[in-house]
Amino acid sequence: MDHATDWAGAVRAAWRAGRDTAPDPVALGLADADRHVLAEPLVTRTDLPAFPTSSVDGWAVRGEGPWRVTGQVLAGAQPPPLDADGDCVEIATGAMVPAGTTAIVRVEESTTGGDGRVTGRPRDKREWREPGEEAAAGEALAPAGSPVTPALVGLAAACGYDELLVRRRPRAEVLVFGDELRSAGLPGQGRVRDALGPQVPAWLRRLGADVDGPAVGPGTDTLEGHLRAISLARDKGADLICTTGGTMRGPVDHLHPALAELGTTYVVDTAAVRPGFPMLLATLPAAGRRTCLVAGLPGNPQSAVVALVTLVTPALAGWLGRPPPDPRALPQVRLGAGIPGRGRDTHLALVRRDPDGTAHPLPHTGSAMLRGLARAAGFAVIVPGSDARAGDVVPMVPLPLFPWEAS
């Protein structure tokens, strides 16, 4: 494993590969921008609100009462100013407050006399929103790399946007290989259930990719089968191809020979991290001067998820214009028990978290196991050449337990 890239270096290289293979941003109308990612900061184009707006139904008054009614202001209209003390206009919630207004009297706290004049007592609190109260013109409200949510679409509309410059979500394909895999029913007779085909697409969606349909496979565990499946995914327009299994270089491991025949270039040819050995990330030329990414995930389930965390998560962050990952910026957790190191490799150890934030190593965390992963909040990072003791504070890579949580 002397050629392996250190874990932090692999994360950085994967981010750069995602950034460098991403297409140019596109402008989409607000109705189509949901679930994409901002390619530039969302900056207000006007004060928000752009003009003073009434917070209540009532009377916009000038001076002391009683007040003479000179008109009505509804939302959407631009009223003339109140020029004289003793004048007022009826005003609706959301309507523009006339210039010259000194107070607004709530309708339920007013009386209209027989002579048509309005009396009442304004509250001490101002009953309208001032321009710029929510945001001033030119203020940055969301940075580039932010996921576009329904709420952000609404904010953009309120700020005067008709379209947003976004990075589209990458299209991903998952290819499962392994003659020993069974896609349905109980394991037995030398065959095991495919645990990656159902879960990897779900991880990818939570990390910001679009995956149409289930994983493809289990595919034929031959060189021809690998060439055919990878070529088909590339030609269908996949931006990211995740394969499972076959990442070793043994006589029955066909991924590396297939990638060589297809003309790929390695970004990371395994990383010095355990579990997760071996993993890879490569670039694959595609039609139209396009380049897609190929992530080779180990066949053991927990190792595959470590490969997702190490290579796919940062690659997608780079693609989507999110900031480069900084392992030093990871959340810090205090360990409730010791975790042994893994020699020269970084150890990503599954942990759960107590309500007080203490992280506890989980049992059932062998490379082929899923029980610990199903309970985990993330991976504690144990640096090479060290053991962690109870009470130590270490970085943690959180798992994206809910959509967009990786943002």
For the regions a protein language model found, what residue spans apply to each?
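Short, glycine/charged-enriched hinge/interface segments at domain edges or termini
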Residues: 2, 17, 41, 57-217, ...
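Short, hydrophobic/aliphatic alpha-helical segments
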Residues: 34-47, 78-90, 136, 281-286, ...
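Helix-rich terminal scaffold detector
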Residues: 1-7, 166-297, 301-307, 318
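Conserved active-site and cofactor/substrate-binding residues in soluble primary-metabolism enzymes
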Residues: 2-9, 25-28, 32, 46, ...
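Short, low-complexity N-terminal leaders and the immediately following helix N-cap/first helix
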Residues: 1-68, 322-343, 348
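Flexible glycine/proline-rich
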Residues: 24-26, 30-31, 53, 258-407
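Generic secondary-structure signature for well-ordered alpha-helical cores
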Residues: 12-23, 38-39, 43, 133, ...
